[in-house]
Amino acid sequence: MLTLYNTMSRKKETFTPLHPGEIRMYVCGPTVYNYIHIGNARSAIAFDTIRRYFEYRGYKVTYVSNFTDVDDKIINAAHKTGEAPLDLAQRFIDAFMEDTTALGIEPATAHPRASQMIPDIIEFVQDLIDKEYAYAVDGDVYYRARKFKHYGELSHQNVDELEEGASQHITQDELAKKEDPIDFALWKAAKPGEISWESPWGKGRPGWHIECSVMSTKLLGDTFDIHGGGQDLEFPHHENEIAQSEAKTDKQFVRYWMHNGFVTIGEDDEKMSKSLGNFITVHDIRKTVDPQVLRFFMAGTQYRMPIRYSETNLKNAANSLNRLKIARENLTYRRRGAETGVDPQITKQLQTLKDRFVTAMDDDINVQNGLTVLFDLAKLLNEYANEETVKSESINDLLNEYDAWLQIFGVVFADQKSLDADIDALVKARDAARAAKDFAKSDQIRDQLAAQGIILEDTPQGTRWRRQ
């Protein structure tokens, strides 16, 4: 039974999709004004892992993740570089796709952009004005937050407390325009030199929150299963999305809210963020760290928990990944000479492990417990590889399940079915030299292979080789 922690209820709930066998989910994507840092990547990796597990469980997943390409940060960055805002946004969208591809993140079913949905956004805002949930002032349009009776429920905050906080963080100009300090912008009047579009309220551009409401409901419907994002988006972004969407449709917006934890760095476990200037971009880290190691490191922590970034933790992830790789290579090698048929004991052990894996992952995607079972499966691969007699169908069953679990964590190892002919020939030549007790030649071949990054392992079943 699959359970997910719902931020709205603050508890784990049994997951029941709106449409049997299908999951529709929306995950807030990046504001594209810079390269993504590993804190941004954590969210993308966490929800890619969740999506992959849903697919492993047999669900058809429609996964939408947006690009915010109209925003104050983009306008400011473009002003500094001299680029047009949408050109700068496109440059960093391309960089995002390159980084996430390297991290083994599957492309979303759709990657909508705010700039491509301006007519839909204007229509959405007008509907809110018509229903008296919004009002226009001097080209700006604001949402009447207090009118929405459920405002504050997602973040579990009292409206009066929100008012006190909002009053301390808005300008005098905003305070003069707004009916209430907690009201927020749906549409912003154009400023000189800024990108803008024509609207019933004059030239302007959309607010951040309205963009996600429009993109998600247009592509997934008025009500969909899961909305995800970082914990920092819970308020005000997701709170405001709910207010806008449910005021317009009079329907529940999202059934399950999922929020991932932060990446921390340094001795004080400070949150990694661009605003604090303590971030490391994926673009830069890829120059020195294998992206698959970074992916495995990130995917190995339950999505709601914080991740501490450190060289030590990366090294541990690399070592764990290598153990998993070696286990696969060991059993793959035994395909040679395997007898046809199935080993009933292996079938039974594999089923037990599958049941344990699903039980672990069904508990709010508990990847730590899931990885424990994955390493137990790796142990079984190694043990079976050392058996004197192995069955071909059992090898295939073990490797197929192993690969399916690895892929949930974004790990794909190169198949060892077709070994390099030259290396194979050298291994056979070394075996012949050993049989002839020509140990000098045997050692010379071992050294030659080692120089190519090939490690040899002498076992009772023959010599195996693997790449470092």
Swiss-Prot record:
Segment forming the signal sequence: none
Cellular compartment(s): Cytoplasm
Documented EC number(s): 6.1.1.16
Keywords for this protein: Aminoacyl-tRNA synthetase, ATP-binding, Cytoplasm, Ligase, Metal-binding, Nucleotide-binding, Protein biosynthesis, Zinc
Cofactor note as given: Binds 1 zinc ion per subunit.
UniProt-annotated binding residues for Zn(2+): 28, 212, 237, 241
This protein's record includes keyword Cell wall biogenesis/degradation: no
GO-annotated biological processes: cysteinyl-tRNA aminoacylation
Protein name: Cysteine--tRNA ligase
Species for this entry: Lacticaseibacillus paracasei (strain ATCC 334 / BCRC 17002 / CCUG 31169 / CIP 107868 / KCTC 3260 / NRRL B-441)
